[in-house]
Structures are given as C-alpha cells and as structure tokens.
A protein has these predicted regions:
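Leucine-rich repeat
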Residues: 1-4, 23-27, 46-51, 70-75, ...
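Leucine-rich solenoid repeat scaffolds
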Residues: 142-199
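Consensus "Asn ladder" position of solenoid repeat domains
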Residues: 12, 35, 56-59, 80-83, ...
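Short intrinsically disordered, low-complexity coil segments enriched in acidic
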Residues: 1-13, 182
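The feature encodes a structural signal of leucine-rich repeats
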Residues: 15-20, 41-43, 65-67, 89-91, ...
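Conserved hydrophobic beta-strand positions in leucine-rich repeat
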Residues: 7-9, 28-32, 52-56, 75-80, ...
Length: 199
C-alpha cells in the first residue's frame, strides 16, 4: 500500500469502527462516506499529513472531532456531515490554513461559532446547519469576502444580523432560518425564514 494515494470505500455498507491503521498510509484523499461506520474518529487520522480531502459523511460516528486533525495542514475539504458528533467547534480550525470547504451539518455540535472561522481567508463554503449552536454570528465571518456559501439554519443562534453583511463586495449565499434572530433584518437578505426571537 506504499504507493496508494486515494482510498475510496464509499457506499459499501461497511460496519464497525474506522481502523486506526489508516493513519499509517500516505494518501492525499480518504473517502468513507455513506457507510455504517460507528465509534469515534480515530486520533491516528491526524497522521495523514498529506491529506487534502477527508470525507466521512453519512455514517454513525460519535464523539468529538479529534484535536489531532489540526495536523492536517494541507486539508482543503472536510466533510463530516450527517453523523452524531458532539462537543463544541474546535479551535483546531486555526491549523487548517488552506481549508476551502467545511461541512459539519446535521450533527449534535453545541456552543458558539468560533471567531477564528472569520479569519480563515481560504474558506469558501461553510455549512454548520442542523446542530445546536448558540450565540451570535461572528461579525468577521459575515465580512469574510472569500466566503461564498454560509449555511447556519436550524440551530439555536440568536441576536441581530448586522447590516454590514450587505456591504460585501462579493456575493454570498446565506441560509439562517429556524434560529432566534431578532429584527430588524438586513434588507439584502430576502428570506429570513421562521425565527424565535427572545425579545
């Protein structure tokens, strides 16, 4: 397996835990999506330092996102959606300097959206929908001109969406429905959806 660069075992009805031995490979892409894998994401995956794309979407993975993944300095795309991951969004995000797409939707993540996400200049797509995130949206995230898509719908977010989101030079696709944002809403947001405002 020394010459293996891309491991794709998607949609194979695989069960059990993700083998920690995968961390010994020298691959740039790992795709295990749409299986029935359980347990935690192995810390050993942090040893895949050449990894550009990690896709563990649509399994039954539990636990927290391991801190070891901060070692994946070349990571451009991380897809962990449709699992049962818990905990807060980790500060290890700061280690992903070239990350372009991050999808953590449909998990059980809690806590605040870290401001570090707004300083990820490479980030183009961020999907945190269908979790239990609360607090405000970091202003610097809305002002990130490289961000093209921001999905935060169906969380427990609250506060006021700042008008500065309308001052962007580059367009962005936003979905905020089913949160607790209070009016007034920025004029440039055409669809805010149902909100449960605490005021």
């Amino acid at each position: 397996l020394e010459r293996l660069q891309y491991l794709n075992l998607a949609q194979n009805q695989l069960t059990g835990h993700i083998p920690s031995e995968l961390g010994k490979l020298n691959i740039y892409r790992l795709n295990l999506e749409f299986n029935q894998l359980t347990g935690n994401i192995p810390e050993e995956l942090g040893s895949l330092t050449e990894l550009v794309h990690l896709n563990l979407e649509s399994n039954q993975l539990r636990g927290k996102i391991p801190v070891s993944l901060s070692k994946l300095k070349r990571l451009k795309k991380l897809e962990l959606q449709n699992n049962q991951l818990i905990g807060k969004l980790p500060e290890i995000i700061s280690g992903w300097k070239v990350l372009e797409e991050l999808n953590l939707s449909n998990n059980k993540l809690t806590g605040l959206i870290p401001e570090i996400l707004g300083r990820q200049d490479s980030l183009k797509v961020l999907n945190l929908s269908f979790n239990y995130l609360d607090g405000d949206i970091p202003i610097n995230l809305l002002q990130n001109e490289n961000l093209e898509l921001l999905y935060l719908h169906v969380n427990n977010l609250q506060g006021i969406i700042p008008e500065t989101v309308c001052w962007r030079e580059n367009p962005i696709k936003l979905l905020f429905y089913s949160n607790g944002f209070c009016p007034p809403y920025p004029e440039c947001i055409k669809y805010i959806g149902k909100q449960i405002c605490g005021n």
